[in-house]
């Protein structure tokens, strides 16, 4: 077998191997066997970077936004290299990536650009999605719902996302769900000028959503799967 690990992760970088299998590391450091540099954001259209595989380097256009997608591309390049793919094949595979429903899928309607990221959520992915939203055109609106399975730190983790949202260059934050009340309150304390809206549940959000959005908005929709925010995406698509 093979082991492929993120060499930029402090804990994973210490792994020496397993049953005599040494890991292949990917990351932004040139100490990794597979590393990236010259990272450029193309806004919501994606990322561009140079990938280094040993003595070979090639530029790739990743058709999904966010710095975290560069790491996914590096991991894919590492696996492809292990299994003997050429750099041309690796590049073509990454550049032909098509997001699936609920996984950072861009939906352009006559009125909005919807960033459909509603399949699941954790604190890290929430923050990453908020970072990407800042590149949107028009008003930047984040429609966020509860994150599940966070254990005893669930309140604190929702507050941390709220603080991050308050520091982001967005226009409206709409928080939905019992735990998201903590997110909304922290965001408002962090940035009193940010328009923060709280809805107790999905049904209430769906009822009032039309009054919160306007033509030209870029709208991020993200929550844990149990929140069923695909209904929010559908509502926006049909406006």
Regions found by a protein language model. Give the residues of each.
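ADP-ribose/adenylate-binding Rossmann-like module
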Residues: 4-6
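Short regulatory helix/loop adjacent to the ATP-binding pocket of P-loop NTPases
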Residues: 12-15
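ATP-dependent carboxylate-amine ligase
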Residues: 17-22, 32, 45, 54-56, ...
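A short, compositionally biased
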Residues: 41-48
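Short beta-strand motif preference
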Residues: 49-51, 60
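Nucleotide/phosphate-binding loop and acidic/charged catalytic motifs
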Residues: 72
């Amino acid at each position: 077998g093979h082991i492929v690990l993120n060499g930029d992760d402090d804990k994973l970088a210490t792994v020496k191997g397993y049953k005599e299998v040494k890991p292949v590391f990917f990351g932004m450091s040139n100490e990794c066997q597979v590393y990236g540099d010259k990272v450029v954001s193309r806004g919501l259209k994606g990322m561009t970077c140079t990938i280094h595989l040993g003595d070979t380097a090639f530029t790739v256009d990743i058709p999904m936004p966010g710095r975290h997608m560069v790491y996914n591309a590096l991991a894919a390049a590492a696996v492809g290299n292990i299994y003997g793919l050429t750099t041309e094949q690796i590049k073509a595979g990454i550049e032909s990536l098509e997001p699936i429903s609920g996984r950072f899928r861009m939906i352009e309607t006559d009125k909005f650009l919807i960033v459909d990221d509603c399949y699941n959520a954790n604190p890290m992915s929430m923050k990453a999605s908020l970072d990407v939203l800042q590149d949107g055109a028009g008003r930047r609106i984040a429609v966020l719902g509860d994150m599940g399975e966070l254990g005893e730190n669930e309140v604190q983790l929702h507050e941390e996302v709220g603080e991050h949202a308050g520091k982001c260059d967005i226009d409206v934050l709409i928080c939905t769900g019992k735990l998201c009340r903590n997110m909304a309150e922290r965001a408002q304390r962090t940035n009193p000028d940010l328009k923060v809206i709280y809805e107790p549940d999905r049904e209430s959000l769906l009822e009032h959503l039309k009054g919160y959005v306007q033509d030209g908005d870029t709208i991020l929709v993200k929550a844990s799967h149990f929140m069923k925010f695909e209904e929010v995406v559908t509502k926006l698509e049909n406006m």
